[in-house]
C-alpha cells in the first residue's frame, strides 16, 4: 500500500502543468516532520507553489521538503516547474526572501515579481511596541492602499516623517523592497486583492 501511495504522489509531483498561470504564489511553511532515518520529529521547510489558472481556479503545483528556506533551493523549484511545461507566469507573489526575485527571473525573465504586502506589514510591526501596532498598521495602510505608485511614495515619505524618529527601521525596509512593491499599484483593485498576500498558501497548512 505504501509503495502504491508513493508512486501516486510521485506521479502527481511530476505531472505536466499548464503552459501559463496568470498568478503563482510561492512560499515556505515551517512544519514538524518525522525524519525517515532517525525517526525523530524535526522542523523542516515545506516549499509550496500555488497557481491560479486561466479559469481563476487555484491549483497546488508542487510541494518540496528541505531543511531550510533559501533562494538557491527556490531556483531548483522554478526550473522544476519549467521542466514540467510551465512556460509563463505573469505575476509571482513571494515573501521577502533575499535573492528570491533573481531566482524567479533566472527561469522566468519576464515575470512580474510582487512581494507579499501583508508579509511586509507584519515584518514592519515587529519593530513596534505593542501599544503602537494598531496605529502604525493604519499608517502603513495609506501606503499600500494608494491609488498609484507616486501616491504610495508620498505616503511612504509621510510615514517616515511621522514615525521615522521612533521606528527608524520601517521605512528603509519598505524602500529596500520597493521594486517588488510597486508592481502592485499597476493592477486594478480586484487583482490587488488577490496578490496582496501569500495567505492562500498559509491556509493550506490549517
Which role does the model predict for each range below?
Residues 59-62, 83-88, 121, 137-144, ...:
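Short acidic, glycine/Ser/Thr-rich loop/turn "cap" segments at secondary-structure junctions
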Residues 2-94, 98, 102-110, 200:
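RNase H-like nuclease fold core
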Residues 108-126:
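Inter-helix linker motif
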Residues 145-206:
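Acidic/histidine-rich catalytic cores and adjacent linkers
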Residues 36, 104, 128, 184-185:
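Short, well-ordered secondary-structure micro-motifs
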Residues 124-154, 158:
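Metal-dependent DNA phosphodiester-chemistry modules and their immediately adjacent helices/loops
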Residues 1-2, 156:
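A general structural motif at alpha-helix termini
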Amino acid at each position: 500500500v505504501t509503495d502504491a501511495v508513493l508512486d501516486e504522489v510521485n506521479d502527481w509531483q511530476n505531472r505536466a502543468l499548464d503552459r501559463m498561470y496568470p498568478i503563482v504564489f510561492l512560499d515556505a511553511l515551517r512544519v514538524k516532520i518525522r525524519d525517515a532515518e532517525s525517526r525523530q520529529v524535526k522542523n523542516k521547510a515545506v516549499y509550496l507553489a500555488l497557481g491560479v489558472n486561466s479559469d481563476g481556479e487555484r491549483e497546488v503545483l508542487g510541494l518540496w521538503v528541505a531543511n531550510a528556506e533559501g533562494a538557491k533551493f527556490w531556483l531548483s523549484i522554478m526550473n522544476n516547474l519549467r521542466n514540467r511545461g510551465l512556460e509563463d507566469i505573469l505575476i509571482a507573489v513571494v515573501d521577502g526572501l533575499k535573492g528570491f526575485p533573481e531566482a524567479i527571473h533566472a527561469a522566468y525573465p519576464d515575470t512580474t515579481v510582487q512581494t507579499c504586502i501583508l508579509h511586509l506589514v507584519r515584518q514592519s510591526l515587529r519593530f513596534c511596541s505593542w501599544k503602537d501596532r494598531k496605529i502604525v498598521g493604519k499608517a502603513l495602510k495609506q501606503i499600500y492602499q494608494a491609488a498609484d505608485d507616486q501616491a504610495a511614495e508620498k505616503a511612504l515619505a509621510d510615514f517616515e516623517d511621522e514615525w521615522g524618529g521612533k521606528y527608524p527601521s520601517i521605512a528603509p525596509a519598505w524602500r529596500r523592497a520597493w521594486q517588488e512593491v510597486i508592481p502592485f499599484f499597476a493592477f486594478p483593485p480586484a487583482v490587488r486583492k488577490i496578490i496582496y498576500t501569500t495567505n492562500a498558501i498559509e491556509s493550506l497548512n490549517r
